[in-house]
């Protein structure tokens, strides 16, 4: 159930009864549970508009909420706030519904969309590094939530598998007579670095590299065979990383830059024909009045370089047109580094003008900040190199396994390693997903692997704590009437029933940290409930009810963490 909507509906009816039906309720959870479950903040605005005394008007609204099936009490506070407390019977009934439904009583959206979400998208011919982590796990979590809420999710891994870097690699391998050799990804990285030096320092080599790019684009069989070898090696590495991270991305989700190669010139020609793109110094440019350059003139969105070459803008336009026209997207999400914000704003504006992005199709740039080291600079190795993602994940698992072994010396090495993988990978992912994605955040091993505070290990341990209760519980009646008599029982019940509200918020805004914050709230609230309300030693009715709350807490934690892409353990 959507608890917020349910309470808001009751409050809106009370507003109508008080003669202010046209005013927004402005409902939000109370900051202090002692004041109730929700607070109405819309009365003061309505009073100002109606030229009435806000406290008197608030009292009318509160009186209209008397004898309500959902709301137990409505108390006026301050200049016109109304604190609402939910009826225990209403909470108990909905706890039963959530407990006995695989979807927790959460309805799928009545307006399902086809959502195309672009995430991860590394450049190929090199190993994935920490810079690829955020897009990969943020995009994966958003896609999981959207699918859970009933949408059709089309994942797109827009890998960088085309362009100058491949011409450089081919030129270098031919020059070194290694074009027929077998090689691995580490070799490709070494070759690429050497080729880049040659490209920057030797004009003749640079010309040769560009010639190979032309051959690649023209379908030369020899060059294409080498290119495919580069791509296959790189994608195999990427998929291994995705599998380690537990991502939903699969090989069939790959739709790289090369996919749109044949569409680039037609898109540019179409923009010219529509009068959007014009020639400027030999390049094809769309001038956008909505954006200004340093001189205050319309900004230039270059779609074709002087000499006929293409850019990211060309590929992204063709890609967007494909996603709307062929994949039938109702909504487009691009999970990309925040530094690309202007590019995507200009892409969307150009696409709207060209008719590639109709008004009934949504498009959003889902930007994210930078992973920082403790020194406040982008996260690097001690030698200043980019941290390879495989190395980071390996270290996470090793550190977590050591911590688990330290806490449980009796564990065998294999069991500690197994638990360590779940805890370590979960810790890395949660440390990221629990932060507002638009912010930079500091990567800190000690903080993320702590069993205290807002961390994956804390939430995973909270889940195992629930499981330990049921290992000792013996028989109990999951269908017995739920009785909520203690304040913490009611508070936990009300919080558990906000699951749908939170998931809908994540689906609407693409901010996974809302879900992380909710799960942490559930875990901390359960800890307080566990300490204050004996479960197994309580008398029969309370025992069953508290076991029901514990069961729903565990199920909610497990489902919520799964939507973040994080596994749980029955024992830690």
From Swiss-Prot:
Listed GO CC annotations: cytoplasm
Leading EC class: ligase
Locus of motif 'HIGH' region: 122-132
GO-annotated biological processes: arginyl-tRNA aminoacylation
Annotated EC: 6.1.1.19
GO MF annotations in UniProt: arginine-tRNA ligase activity; ATP binding
Ranges that cross the membrane: none
CDD domains: Anticodon_Ia_Arg, ArgRS_core
Catalytic activity: tRNA(Arg) + L-arginine + ATP = L-arginyl-tRNA(Arg) + AMP + diphosphate
Keywords from the named record: Aminoacyl-tRNA synthetase, ATP-binding, Cytoplasm, Ligase, Nucleotide-binding, Protein biosynthesis
Compartments where found: Cytoplasm
Subunit details: Monomer.
Homology family: Belongs to the class-I aminoacyl-tRNA synthetase family.
Name of the protein in its database record: Arginine--tRNA ligase
Organism: Neisseria meningitidis serogroup A / serotype 4A (strain DSM 15465 / Z2491)
